[in-house]
From Swiss-Prot:
It catalyses: 5-aminomethyl-2-thiouridine(34) in tRNA + S-adenosyl-L-methionine = 5-methylaminomethyl-2-thiouridine(34) in tRNA + S-adenosyl-L-homocysteine + H(+). Keywords: Cytoplasm, FAD, Flavoprotein, Methyltransferase, Multifunctional enzyme, Oxidoreductase, S-adenosyl-L-methionine, Transferase, tRNA processing. The keyword Plastid does not apply. PANTHER family: SARCOSINE DEHYDROGENASE-RELATED, TRNA 5-METHYLAMINOMETHYL-2-THIOURIDINE BIOSYNTHESIS BIFUNCTIONAL PROTEIN MNMC. Pfam families: DAO, Methyltransf_30. NCBIfam families: MnmC_Cterm, PRK01747.1-2, PRK01747.1-3, PRK01747.1-5, tRNA_MNMC2. GO terms for cellular component: cytoplasm. Catalyzes the last two steps in the biosynthesis of 5-methylaminomethyl-2-thiouridine (mnm(5)s(2)U) at the wobble position (U34) in tRNA. Catalyzes the FAD-dependent demodification of cmnm(5)s(2)U34 to nm(5)s(2)U34, followed by the transfer of a methyl group from S-adenosyl-L-methionine to nm(5)s(2)U34, to form mnm(5)s(2)U34. Residues 1-245 are annotated as: tRNA (mnm(5)s(2)U34)-methyltransferase. Transmembrane segments: none annotated. It comes from Yersinia pseudotuberculosis serotype O:1b (strain IP 31758). Residues 270-689 are annotated as: FAD-dependent cmnm(5)s(2)U34 oxidoreductase. This is tRNA 5-methylaminomethyl-2-thiouridine biosynthesis bifunctional protein MnmC. Its cofactor is FAD.
Length: 689
């Protein structure tokens, strides 16, 4: 997925005060009454709001071509909120709205357009507060305490549609086929769009559109829709509505299939870190019943227990799955952390910005590659030594890249607060429960703990045990590594207290935390080492790295590690630096089932390829891990992905990126190339018990 910045909308305003697209030379909504037009064409055209009451599932999925000012979305949201007030016991509880927009508006233009509809003001204000930067790809926005999920896909709809993954097949309940008039925007209205709509629509799903153009009607009919002409809005004589009578076959990549959970009313999460807490909350937003088991006496005793952690995206300039994921993850994380703060969830933090320094030739080359993309300056920007030093408050000694929305937060504070929030929402926690064995018995998972503790049984299990993930029989073959990291806690000084931003070099240094008057500097990186004892050599090395990377300036000499204050944790790392999230793959079954996968794809007929079975997984067993040293950035999005997968919902990333997060990816890549999968013993197989 191309995450490069995209062109924003250029607007003018006509005599009626209606916004006009300069790109398409067309108005965004009717000069007569845009709100009434939306109600007539898109809501009533699809049978809403009347359909809310009879909807048989807890979630209703809408898709739209052309988000524009968001008028359709805001009107639907308002009507749904009214429905929920009037029918609190109805089956339907959540809306999922997927919209494609080639030229997103600036937030100031949104505000000007929204001013015309004071009745939508409260909803529009919430939308604008979460409005994403103009980066191509999916921006998942959670509104109304999770009752509304908005997936904004920025980019050309016909470029985006082929990149979508299987989770959108046969899912959409209603389409708002909007966008500018076919005569003004002919590239959008084509066979590819109509066929994709049919593929994504569930049987009985509907569409409506303002146009009655003959080629649109014929294209939708050929794609499989039953199409009807009805009265248009205002002076427009006709418009089109329709229904998909039967499911349309959709091609899939079965080797990367992501199964939903059969039961979400009895989920056990194993783990006590930040991703465990975020996953619990993401599941609870959807109505899941969650029980958490943690080996320690309290949460955040592992890698999530540090005092300060830097939050910034991982870029590489390759426009690949890694850059796509971390761009989306970073922006999603900031939105979610800000929402938590607005809810009164307290944790030490400063959104002070992060500066990544070009301290040697290798790091300079990496940063130059990152900056080949002309990122929005609100996301990332090249800066000189002088510019970085002015922002940081101390001489940075080097040029670099600046992330203005980055900063630091206290992982320990945040994890504790999230656990408390999940408990307030009904999660049961069992601390000092160290999982010893996991066994499938009678369609349930039996969890065996210490000798004095009774075994527990749950329908569905999520493993989120960090570097201990490969300890279980079911996860033994996953290529995960344990990496020890010691972070030094250093007292501030009058000079160090001037540091205003997180500095990243061959290590990192945080600004002073006002809560304890200390900075954090780190961290060591000892692969395969799971000990958490204090080590003087690593304490001194943390300081030496700063001195080596900034030899031109004197202020790093102020860093004093002599009081030996530090904390050590063990990360769970993967060689491609991407997390693993999804169902736990069955290693032996995968190798047996896909031993001739490459031949079947390359030389088999169409029927043989279509007969390839979905990837084998352990039933009702899921995992999230391998977050490495970027957990603060990646944890919110991987938690959301896992919860959405388990509930069978559309996922907020393209197919290529989701494949790169699949726990079976290393095996499948080799099998697709016809290469043998080597059985190996990852470093994490040494037990910490």
């Amino acid at each position: 997925m191309n995450q490069r910045p995209i062109q924003t909308a250029t607007l003018s305003w006509n005599e009626q005060g209606t916004p006009v697209s300069e790109q398409f030379g067309d108005i965004y909504f009717s000069n007569e009454d845009g709100l009434e037009e939306t109600h007539h064409v898109f809501l009533k055209g699809n049978g809403f709001p009347a359909r809310f009451a009879s909807h048989p599932q807890q979630s209703c999925i809408f898709a739209e071509t052309g988000f524009g000012t968001g008028l359709n979305f805001l009107t639907l949201w308002r009507d749904f909120a009214l429905f929920r007030q009037q029918s609190p016991n109805a089956t339907l509880r959540r809306l999922h709205y997927i919209s494609f927009e080639k030229y997103p508006l600036h937030v100031a233009d949104l505000a000007s357009a929204h001013a015309r509809w004071p009745e939508l003001a409260s909803f529009a204000e919430q939308l604008r507060a979460q409005w994403p930067l103009p980066l191509a790809g999916c921006h998942r926005i959670l509104l109304a305490d999770g009752a509304i999920t908005l997936d904004l896909w920025f980019g050309d709809v016909n470029t985006l549609l082929p990149t979508l993954d299987d989770s959108l097949n046969n899912q959409v309940d209603a389409w708002f086929l909007d966008g500018f008039a076919p005569a003004k925007n002919p590239d959008m209205w084509n066979e590819q769009l109509f066929n994709a709509m049919a593929r994504m629509t569930r049987p009985g799903g509907t569409f409506s559109t303002f146009t009655a153009a003959g080629f649109v009607r014929r294209g939708l009919q050929q794609a499989g829709f039953n199409v009807t002409k009805v009265k248009g809005f205002g002076q427009k004589r006709e418009m089109l509505t329709g229904t998909l009578p039967q499911q349309i076959h959709a091609p899939t990549a079965p080797w990367y299939h992501r199964p939903a959970a059969t039961r979400c009313d009895d989920i056990a999460i194993i783990g006590g870190g930040i991703v465990s807490a975020l996953t619990a909350l993401a599941l609870q937003r959807r109505g899941a019943v969650v029980t958490l088991y943690c080996a320690d006496a309290q949460p955040a005793q592992g890698a999530s227990g540090n005092r300060q952690g830097a939050l910034y995206p991982l870029l590489n300039g390759k426009n690949d799955a890694l850059e796509t994921f971390f761009t989306s993850a970073f922006t999603f994380a900031r939105r979610q952390y800000d929402q938590l703060l607005e809810q009164g969830i307290a944790f030490d933090h400063q959104w002070c910005g992060v500066s990544q320094l070009a301290f040697d030739d290798k790091s300079r080359g990496k940063i130059e590659k990152m900056l080949h993309t002309q990122w929005p300056v609100e996301f990332a920007e090249a800066m000189s030594r002088e510019q970085l030093s002015e922002l940081a408050g101390l001489d940075c000694a080097h040029d670099g890249i600046h992330y203005p929305a980055g900063g630091w937060l206290c992982p320990s504070d945040l994890t504790h607060a999230l656990m408390m929030l999940a408990q307030q929402h009904g999660m049961t926690c069992h601390y000092q429960h160290e999982l010893q064995r996991l066994k499938r018995i009678d369609n349930q998972w039996q969890l065996t703990f210490g000798q004095s503790q009774a075994a527990k049984h749950h329908a569905t299990v999520i493993l989120a045990t960090g570097h201990r993930l490969p300890e279980w029989e079911q996860t033994h073959h996953l290529p995960l590594s344990a990496v020890r990291g010691q972070v030094s806690h250093i007292p501030t000084t009058p000079v160090l207290s001037q540091l205003q931003q997180v500095l990243c070099y061959d290590g990192y240094l945080t600004p002073v935390n006002p809560a304890n008057q200390h900075h954090c500097i780190g961290a060591s990186y000892q692969r395969g080492d799971i000990a958490t004892d204090f080590r003087l050599t690593e304490q001194q090395e943390n300081r030496e790295r700063l001195l080596r990377c900034l030899p031109q300036v004197s202020w790093p000499q102020q860093v004093d590690v002599s009081d030996n204050q530090a904390r050590c944790g063990v990360r769970c790392a993967i060689r491609d630096h991407l997390p693993m999230v999804g169902a736990v793959p069955d290693y032996a079954a995968t190798l047996a089932q896909y031993q001739d996968l490459s031949r079947r794809i390359q030389h088999g007929g169409e029927s043989e390829v279509n007969d390839i079975a979905v990837a084998p997984v352990w039933p009702e067993l899921f995992m999230v891990g391998g977050l490495g040293s970027r957990g603060l950035c990646s944890a919110p999005l991987v938690a959301e992905i896992l919860a959405a997968q388990m509930f069978g919902e559309p996922l907020p990333l393209d197919a290529k990126t989701l494949a790169a997060l699949n726990p079976n990816r290393f095996w499948i890549r080799k099998l697709l190339k016809g290469r043998p999968v080597q059985t190996r013993s990852p470093a994490t197989q040494e037990s910490s018990r």
